[in-house]
């Protein structure tokens, strides 16, 4: 049964679809599977559909919802510097360029993904990995973020933690 669940998660995720995460065990299996894929399979390239109206790409497909939001970030500014214990989170740069830096908790190795809005891709943030996004361009950075759950200010599952550790 466990192997079937993991196989189903893999098949769904291979199609860039986030599986149903209503069941706590399925959520934990999905987070474990994403952790297994990281960092070799990041960022994940997406298909850019363009015509005379402009361009479109599908960044998030999910079987059970969640919350998406956009942010703008001024040149040189860093957002984040925190980690999550359970939250499934996806970053998609829509316009501009950025470095997404991720560090596994209790490790000092930082993985950096340089991404651009004109080269659509997503980066899923593994649980228990502190992360940040920095606008590395001169223009405003526009980023779409998605989480599998609605934000709850009484239980945010967001713990402050530096990505780049200071050397002593």
PLM features: residue spans?
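Short beta-strand His + acidic residue motifs that chelate non-heme Fe in jelly-roll/DSBH
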Residues: 56, 80-82, 100-102, 123-125, ...
